[in-house]
Each structure stands twice: as structure tokens, then as C-alpha cells.
């Protein structure tokens, strides 16, 4: 893709997200979401092959359906309230349709089927954008409409997403699919706490984006896409191996790493709201994610797969300029637990 075209596409995608973040008008929110959707499709098709085209088509059909449901809900709300403001979402039908549309855009269960397939069919850099930046706009709409969302609709979606995110990643060998199922589980945690403390959802989103970005950067550096290629990382770049180990355990939520913070705070927040069964189910289900990340860690660091790679080990990075962000991102992704007391301002 030529640099001027790529620049225009990226600016359109960023502009769409900014429009959604700064708007309280339903029509402009819908326009921003459409800009976001249309801009990423050429990025998903950057590598011209049948898998990328199939992934782009699946993404387009799913997101177009979600946009249609969202516009229908907005129109019904306009018919009843006569206003476009997001704060005037009073109709239960509108609330249900908006929640369903946002769940489709985020990949929440039972609308999650497109996330692993689309992520697997794209390049690692495109998958990074899909699993991080593309979550910001729908979650911001969810943040704005959280007072009017029906808990009986959103909470079952959130719990099911955590279950699917754990079960789906158990038998996977493709790293992009594993990260996609991990994304589904993280979206479930975020949407569960949105109803009770939307600000905590923003904290969870920030930590999730940082951890996922760092993981994708390391995978792109090694051109790692499968568990087999991940198991040979020690042979190509020994310095990368412990970083990947720490990041995967952090994504799984193992204390005392950074990924444990949002899970801990979300369970605490739900318990404060006199909910016992739901956070218990969420905590137990989170062990599924931790299990398949620990299995990856075991295959990467504690076993030696048969390898024909005779190249010399890389004890330093080839291009330091490309990896300049890796050190701060790795520190934030693994060592945020000591600052947890400062996060009491979210209560």
C-alpha cells in the first residue's frame, strides 16, 4: 500500500474514533462508527490473498449488520423522544437494539464468531489495530449509554463472553486466534463493570491495549504466528523469550503482574454492589485464560522442540529505533501492581 493512501486511511480511522469520543449526538456517533469501519477494511486487505479478502468480507458484513441495527434503534428513539441526544435514550427497545449493535461491533458473545476468523486471516499489524483501536469507539458509546442499559441483557453477554474467551482458546495453535479469544474475554470483563463503574472500564481498556500492543510488537519482531514458531523463539532471540513469557502471564491475569489489576478491581466493584455469584463465576472462568497462556509459556521456555534453525542467536535487537517503545510498554504491561493504591480514586 502506498504511503499517501495509507496516511489517508489512518487519518480517516482516527477521525472516526475522535468523532465518536467527542459527540453526544446519535447521528454523528453513527457517522464516526461508519468511518471507523470503512477505513479499516483496506488495512485488513493489505496482504492481497484469499484469506485476507475473506476476513475483510466477514468483517464488513458483520459490522454493516450492526450499523443497521444501531440506526434502526436510533430511529425508534427519535420517534419516541424527538431528540438525537444520547442522554435521551429512554425507550427500552432502543436500549436493547443499541446494546446488541455494540455487542456485535465489540465481538461479545453470542456475536463473537467473526473475531477469531477475521483476526486469523489478517497480518499481525492489522490484527493489532482490529483488537485494540477498533474497540475504543464502541466502548465509548457503551460508556455514554451505561445509565440506560438493561443489566439483564448485558450481564449474560459479558459472562458468556468470558466463558467463550476461555474455552475457545484451549485447543488453538494459532497465536492470532488465541489473542482474539483473549480479546473476547477481556471485552466481557469490561462490559460487566460498565454498568456499575464506567470509569473502571476505561482503566481496564487502557491496560488491555498496552498489553496487547506489546505482545503483538514482539510477535511481529519474530514473525511468530504459531505455537511451533513461538517455541523456537529461544533459538532466534533469547532476550525476547522472557518478555513474551511475562506478557502472556500478564494477559492471563496472573498476580503480581499488571493484568491482575483490572480483574481484581472489577471483582471488588461487583462485590460492593452485593453481587456474589457473578464475580465468582468470572474469577473461576478467568483460570481458563490463565491455563492456555501458561501452556504457551511452558512450550516456549521449558521445552525444546526439534529445530533445524542453525542461525546465530540475537543477543541484541537488529534495529533499536523500531523497538524504542518496547521497554516502557513492557514495564507498564508487567509492573503496574505497586501503583494500585493510587487507583482508589476510581471508587
UniProtKB/Swiss-Prot annotation:
Please state where this protein is localized. Mitochondrion inner membrane
- Tell me which EC number(s) this protein carries: 7.1.1.2
- Identify which top EC class this enzyme belongs to: translocase
Q: Name one GO cellular component term.
A: mitochondrial inner membrane
Q: Which UniProt keywords apply?
A: Electron transport, Membrane, Mitochondrion, Mitochondrion inner membrane, NAD, Respiratory chain, Translocase, Transmembrane, Transmembrane helix, Transport, Ubiquinone
**Organism superkingdom:** Eukaryota
Q: Which GO terms describe its molecular function?
A: NADH dehydrogenase (ubiquinone) activity
Query: What are the TM regions of this chain, as residue ranges?
Result: 3-23, 25-45, 60-80, 96-116, 149-169, 178-198, 200-220, 237-257, 274-294, 323-343
**The keyword Iron belongs to this UniProt entry's keyword annotation:** no
Q: Which reaction does it catalyse?
A: a ubiquinone + NADH + 5 H(+)(in) = a ubiquinol + NAD(+) + 4 H(+)(out)
BP-aspect Gene Ontology terms = mitochondrial electron transport, NADH to ubiquinone; mitochondrial respiratory chain complex I assembly
Family membership, please give it.
Belongs to the complex I subunit 2 family.
Q: What does this protein do?
A: Core subunit of the mitochondrial membrane respiratory chain NADH dehydrogenase (Complex I) which catalyzes electron transfer from NADH through the respiratory chain, using ubiquinone as an electron acceptor. Essential for the catalytic activity and assembly of complex I.
Protein known as: NADH-ubiquinone oxidoreductase chain 2
Q: What is the lineage of its organism?
A: Eukaryota, Metazoa, Chordata, Craniata, Vertebrata
